[in-house]
């Protein structure tokens, strides 16, 4: 990693632990900062805080005392999940204390070039695809960021022979200043996380931070299926490389079932190893990045053909007596479920949907669920999802939780059918995150097979 001294002897407050906060605290300590960690979880239930204290780092747990900010901190590094209307952050900003996320730290120390991927849907799959293609081409793509490996941790081991392939959420991108990828990808922009950002325009502004420091020597890969992306083209200094499944563009595009890059066929769409129109978009974004990094077509084709998907993202789980089970727990909004359904014959799909009630109706989903074999509906949003099912003329049953839903879906299916968990809702009404929800689905499928 690069040796930098800008944090040496500076007092830094790390707000919130989890993986990224713990990694940031250790890195800052290594860089000579005087680190204080503040986390809301009580110390006795907080193994990360216990470990940091043993390493000599000051920890304050069990709450977020505002008076802590009366100390003269030069910087706050916040966990990306903590919103900016948190009183600690509001007070820090009022005092003129810069508030960053650990992604900024990763950029500052990284010897490896960075490819950053953000967007509303498809981030993790596209990040993984890019990482696998680059690695197959000998460029060693190191996955990091929102994909589960703290960027500041991976950046410490990356050399200039590697490439940091970094999945970035809007939460993370709100806390960057100098962050400068050589290639950035925005998969799409849809109205999500409005409860965090306050408005769609603020959400887009957070995503757009990915290109703030880019120049004409850098490349910004945008989804020209969206008029919004086309409108944003004039607002960046970077060189824009478009991709589209709807039109021929000066980049990566779909035409007559083939995936092209600037007029050259790379592979057939039906050769991609995972189903769904959204994965065609993800593959096109990957092809654009790969060609910008001089990867040959054969390597791209072989890697994307063998691509098996990502856990919780239209993940094939198992086949029980001819019934296939797919875990798409990551589909926490309507668009993601629409794209998941596009890869299947509705008449053979039993869809499990429902979750956290954010107050939105599901009318947009009606055309996509029309013709489904059956639905199994659960969660806080069940009444709203049932209204959409009624409009679509789809029969449904209700379930109490994911295990119950999985069993009922299997009872409704016959050989040749698909049981698809694609909730179109966040998980927080019942489960800590979409991973827990997806894991319970996987576990129940395993029990059904016994």
UniProtKB/Swiss-Prot annotation:
Instruction: Tell me the InterPro entries matching this sequence.
Output: Mur-like_cat_sf, Mur_ligase_C, Mur_ligase_C_dom_sf, Mur_ligase_cen, MurD
Task: Return one GO MF term.
Answer: ATP binding
Cite a GO CC annotation: cytoplasm
Q: Which Pfam families match?
A: Mur_ligase_C (PF02875), Mur_ligase_M (PF08245), MurD-like_N (PF21799)
Q: Does the keyword Hydrolase apply?
A: no
Look up keyword Ligase and say if it applies. yes
Q: What is its EC number?
A: 6.3.2.9
Chief site of localization: cytoplasm
Task: Name the keywords, alphabetized.
Answer: ATP-binding, Cell cycle, Cell division, Cell shape, Cell wall biogenesis/degradation, Cytoplasm, Ligase, Nucleotide-binding, Peptidoglycan synthesis
Enzyme class, top EC level, equals ligase
**Reactions the enzyme catalyzes:** UDP-N-acetyl-alpha-D-muramoyl-L-alanine + D-glutamate + ATP = UDP-N-acetyl-alpha-D-muramoyl-L-alanyl-D-glutamate + ADP + phosphate + H(+)
GO BP annotations of the record are:
cell division; cell wall organization; peptidoglycan biosynthetic process; regulation of cell shape
Q: In which pathway does it act?
A: Cell wall biogenesis; peptidoglycan biosynthesis
Residues that bind ATP, according to the entry? Answer: 119-125
Task: Report the SUPFAM superfamilies cross-referenced here.
Answer: MurCD N-terminal domain, MurD-like peptide ligases, catalytic domain, MurD-like peptide ligases, peptide-binding domain
Record localization: Cytoplasm
Family note: Belongs to the MurCDEF family.
HAMAP family in the record: MurD
Purpose of the protein: Cell wall formation. Catalyzes the addition of glutamate to the nucleotide precursor UDP-N-acetylmuramoyl-L-alanine (UMA).
> PANTHER family, alphabetically?
UDP-N-ACETYLMURAMOYLALANINE--D-GLUTAMATE LIGASE (PTHR43692:SF1)
Per its record, how is this protein called by name? UDP-N-acetylmuramoylalanine--D-glutamate ligase
């Amino acid at each position: 990693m690069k040796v930098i001294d800008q944090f040496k002897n500076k007092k830094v407050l790390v707000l919130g632990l989890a993986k990224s906060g713990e990694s940031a605290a250790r890195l800052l300590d290594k860089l000579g900062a005087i680190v204080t960690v503040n986390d809301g979880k009580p110390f006795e239930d907080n193994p990360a805080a216990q470990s940091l204290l043993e390493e000599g780092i000051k920890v304050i747990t069990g709450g977020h005392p505002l008076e802590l900010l009366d100390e003269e901190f030069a910087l706050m590094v916040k966990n990306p999940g903590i919103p900016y209307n948190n009183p600690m952050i509001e007070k820090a900003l009022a005092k003129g204390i810069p508030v960053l996320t650990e992604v900024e730290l990763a950029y500052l120390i990284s010897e490896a070039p960075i490819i950053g991927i953000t967007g509303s849907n498809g981030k993790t799959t596209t990040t993984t695809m890019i990482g696998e293609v680059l690695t197959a081409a000998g460029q060693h793509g190191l996955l990091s960021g929102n994909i589960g490996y703290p960027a500041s941790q991976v950046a410490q081991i990356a050399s200039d022979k590697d490439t940091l392939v970094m999945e970035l959420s809007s939460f993370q991108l709100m806390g960057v200043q100098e962050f400068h990828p050589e290639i950035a990808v925005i998969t799409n922009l849809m109205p999500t996380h409005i409860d965090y950002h306050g408005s769609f325009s603020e959400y887009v502004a957070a995503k757009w931070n990915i290109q703030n420091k880019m120049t004409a020597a850098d490349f910004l890969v945008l989804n020209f299926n969206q008029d919004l992306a086309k409108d944003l083209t004039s607002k960046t200094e970077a060189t824009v490389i478009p991709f589209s499944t709807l039109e021929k563009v000066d980049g990566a595009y779909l035409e007559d079932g083939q995936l092209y890059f600037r007029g050259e066929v790379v592979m057939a769409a039906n050769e991609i190893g995972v189903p769904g129109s959204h994965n065609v978009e993800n593959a096109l974004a990957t092809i654009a990045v790969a060609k910008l990094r001089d990867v040959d077509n054969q390597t791209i084709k072989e890697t994307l053909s063998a691509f098996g998907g990502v856990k919780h993202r239209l993940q094939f789980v198992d086949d029980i007596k001819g019934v296939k089970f797919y875990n798409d727990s990551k589909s926490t909004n309507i668009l993601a479920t629409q794209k998941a359904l596009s890869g299947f014959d509705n008449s053979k799909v039993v869809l499990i949907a429902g979750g956290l009630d954010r107050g939105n109706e599901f009318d947009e989903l009606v055309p996509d669920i029309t013709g489904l074999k059956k639905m199994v509906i659960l969660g806080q949003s069940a009444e709203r999802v049932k209204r959409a099912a009624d409009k679509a003329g789809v029969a449904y049953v209700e379930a109490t939780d994911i295990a119950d839903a999985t069993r009922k879906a299997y009872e409704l299916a016959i050989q040749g059918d698909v049981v698809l968990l694609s909730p179109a809702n966040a998980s927080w009404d019942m489960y800590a995150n979409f991973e827990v929800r997806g894991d319970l689905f996987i576990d129940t499928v395993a029990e059904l097979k016994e």
